[in-house]
Amino acid sequence: MSRRLSLPAGAPVTVAVSPVRSPGGDAVVRRGSGLTSPVPRHSLGSSTATLQVSPVRRSGGSRYLGASRDGGADESAEFVHYTVHIPPTPDRATASVASEAEAAAEAEEVHRPQRSYISGTIFTGGLNCATRGHVLNFSGEGGATAASRAAASGNMSCKMRGCDMPAFLNGGRPPCDCGFMICKECYAECAAGNCPGCKEAFSAGSDTDESDSVTDDDDDEAVSSSEERDQLPLTSMARKFSVVHSMKVPGAAANGNGKPAEFDHARWLFETKGTYGYGNALWPKDGHAHSGAGFVAADEPPNFGARCRRPLTRKTSVSQAILSPYRLLIAIRLVALGFFLAWRIRHPNPEAVWLWAMSVACEVWFAFSWLLDSLPKLCPVHRAADLAVLAERFESPTARNPKGRSDLPGIDVFVTSADPEKEPPLVTANTILSILAADYPVEKLACYLSDDGGALLSFEALAETASFARTWVPFCRKHGVEPRCPEAYFGQKRDFLKNKVRVDFVRERRKVKREYDEFKVRVNSLPEAIRRRSDAYNAGEELRARRRQQEEAAAAAAAGNGELGAAAVETAAVKATWMSDGSHWPGTWTCPAADHARGDHAGIIQAMLAPPTSEPVMGGEAAECGGLIDTTGVDVRLPMLVYVSREKRPGYDHNKKAGAMNALVRTSAIMSNGPFILNLDCDHYVHNSSALREGMCFMLDRGGDRVCFVQFPQRFEGVDPSDRYANHNLVFFDVSMRAMDGLQGPMYVGTGCVFRRTALYGFSPPRATEHHGWLGRRKIKLFLTKKKSMGKKTDRAEDDTEMMLPPIEDDDGGADIEASAMLPKRFGGSATFVASIPVAEYQGRLLQDTPGCHHGRPAGALAVPREPLDAATVAEAIGVISCFYEEKTEWGRRIGWIYGSVTEDVVTGYRMHNRGWRSVYCVTPRRDAFRGTAPINLTDRLHQVLRWATGSVEIFFSRNNALFASPRMKLLQRVAYFNAGMYPFTSVFLLAYCLLPAVSLFSGKFIVQRLSATFLAFLLVITLTLCLLALLEIKWSGITLHEWWRNEQFWVIGGTSAHPAAVLQGLLKVIAGVDISFTLTSKPGNGGGDGGVGGEGNDDEAFAELYEVRWSYLMVPPVTIMMVNAVAIAVAAARTLYSEFPQWSKLLGGAFFSFWVLCHLYPFAKGLLGRRGRVPTIVFVWSGLISMIISLLWVYINPPAGARERIGGGGFSFP
């Protein structure tokens, strides 16, 4: 029995037409009233052929009015589909109204933001508590599934095109998790493929119970077909490219084996434009105008492999006109220092031997420290990435990837936060918004926020961020705004209309700006909202508890037990923190309690944004999709966003930030398993949306399989224009790091770094190399094999052993059973995590056609949908963040971030370089990759430097000292790491050397017996070479002289304040075992829009912290040095003026060095004065008077030798 299809008014009807002649030679046209009528066409080149429509045939289910695709006389034939718009007629009016309503419902279903079961459930678990999921009640966010909405509206018909049969439910739900309604017959045809709704494979449990739906044999066939589909052979694409009929093997369709026609590869390789076609998927579009005549003399055969040989990156050395003089000056200054120190040792000062000895010891150490700092700077390089080649190689249609899906590997972004009070949630929200809007394939990006404090404020701020991201991310993609951090974008002082051509940009920018302002208000009001909500719920709980206790007391009194009744009146004093759905927050409470304290709470995982689909989801007009802006033609998908708070319990060491990072590594491996990891601090946002692509260029280029991480320079905002405390640190990031890039690679500095996941797992590089000979230039290739352990090894031996990647399949076809068996012992007991390791290694490989790559992956292997995220996966992730998971494993010792130091970043990078890995320094040319905030207050800056220096002292006294590095580390790379661990000890000699001028002025002695011409000549040569080296460094690094001088000043400030304290703390930890604890550096908030990121306020408000004086014990040594030198200059000047035999040379020598010390400490003194104009003038007057009094008293106490008798006889009198 036939049925009339319900088509909407004016709906297009697709008709397949092919030119076929009748047997009699006349053209006969036949029409069919169906949706599709595919008819074979034998030639597209025939212009005389007439059009014929085949008779309509029904399929087996009598649902489609048209021929089956597999039917027909010739299977190799292809079809042309024409779209015909049928106008509405009176007999179709009723169906049109119904179908229009159905179409509107479908459109609303597409554009409505949905929350899956995973994104609407918070998972908790940990020690002595079961893993459970708590479904959150989101009333206003569209939490109902598509199936429930369809059931509520009564729309239970099949959604397949041309079918209106009733849909079937498997266990009360559709066969696919996306909620796409499909009937039984359509499902039987699609069961072996993908769901027509979400374009992903059907769930494993979606098969029906009927025996005629999908049998076991069909399952085996489905598995084999999916494997064949993953391989994507060229023959399967025969129908999807514009290849003419002559390219098919004749008679292949009638061979009776049911297989499609084979593709003639030999003929295809030598086809011309005339027979193959011009402008198709494989032919370059930049050819000549001879599109129909084949190759001519002027045309060259296209080189289809040219793009594979184009490099993704370029490395250029510094110009020899700059580098050669730079190296020569280093050699000249080294020789001059050697002769100078030899002369100083041979010419002591007999009048002040102790002064001479101290000065010589300091000068020898300074020369040694300068040599360690200069040697790694001999080979600076510059690198550049080509994003066009990256897009062409990994995102263009190919035979294995006809749809042009992205073949780029996945990236998991880690954002760490520990205390929302010192790290404002709005700062973290801006960082996450910039990550979600990054220019990278949405389905390949995942963002994880680690809240090490387990605060509800961070959780709800992240939920607000996910809600605002649905407006902000499409706005960024539509208009291509930069930067994609809303606070920085709306706060920048420039013309935001530059290069904008869309007429709706101004209107939509105004809407988004207002929405962002409301978003900031909501985030800023969260602490008060949480407090009021918790107080209300706690008050209700207390009332219910009191009522229940009064009832029990009354019952006890009636029973005659008065004491029990009086005791029952006491109410519970526990003050819980409540979530918005009326349940207890499983993390840290505002009033700490058992299992809810900062160091004692369960593990929490919540997917705020579920993983996106593999196919783009285009938006629509604001009125249709319910959004704020028009997103027509804009992909509105969002990357996966996950909240993670690891479990903490008393008695288990949580290892600070390194432990949190390792917990994120394990969680992400189970939930998304991106082969690359980007680490960002909560105050470092993505300033260049293409930064991730630039990092991938270095990872995926030739030799990229040996790159463990790509480090980006740190750039800062909110720093005062004069950069008083050298917060930009450009000498380190633009000079030292560029120079190390020419060796084995830069250090890891804690943020803005893209890691290779397998390198973090402690595996060795694919091709290890030992460096020997002069400067480590002679290389020896190693063939690494697994060494069997005999007996007990020390921890150091275990760290130095090789750990090669367990291959998915060896060349001989067998797996490395021994290596696979060792993985659970190294990585823990999670089988899911262990199984993800070889998958991540395979996805991080280079392409097979990359030059020099022997074990690459085929192109298009990653252009497949991601596996859906289910509750079992999240429950497994809860297990790997438990407090006891790392026990008896190698986490923190060899795997992941290394424990035992407050500078875990430097140690982690050192371990990778020590195994033979390389790193790359990526400086983006046009825009900074990432930007963050820096502490502009003097006290905060000194405490930051103290933490870094203390970590260096710990490294120096540990087995991570570069003196014990393996032969796989280059010699100059060892020198750089050794200098990183030794530089705090220079502060001991710097303190003494800064006091030597004052001691010399007070005592009237000098470090040399007399200022000879030889001594002055040595000083002149050493000073001139230092200045010339600085100028050349400025030339090849691009920094300014002002920035170089600020760095020199703060080197003295830090060396006389924070570094000595770091040496003392490090010695106490090594000798006495005193543990070192640090507090977080407070991040400036940006909630008001005046300070912080991109603030628009005036200088006084933006840099208020710069002028705030907070006293610290670290300020005592620099203040003492300044006062002593100032008083010494005054005393020496007064003594020389009143002396009968003045020694001006000693005064000038001592005063010159004291002035040198005071010039370097000038920013420190300026910071102590606070805001300009706030210090009263009387302070300067009294300071001058006190200095004069001290000077005169010193002259009276210790007068010159010629004036003692006169002063003693006549008393003290002014001249």
From Swiss-Prot:
EC number, as in UniProt: 2.4.1.-
Enzyme class per UniProt: transferase
Record carries keyword Heme: no
Single GO BP term: plant-type primary cell wall biogenesis
GO cellular component: Golgi apparatus; Golgi membrane; plasma membrane
UniProt xrefs under PANTHER family: X-BOX TRANSCRIPTION FACTOR-RELATED
Protein name, per record: Cellulose synthase-like protein D4
Source organism (scientific name): Oryza sativa subsp. japonica (Rice)
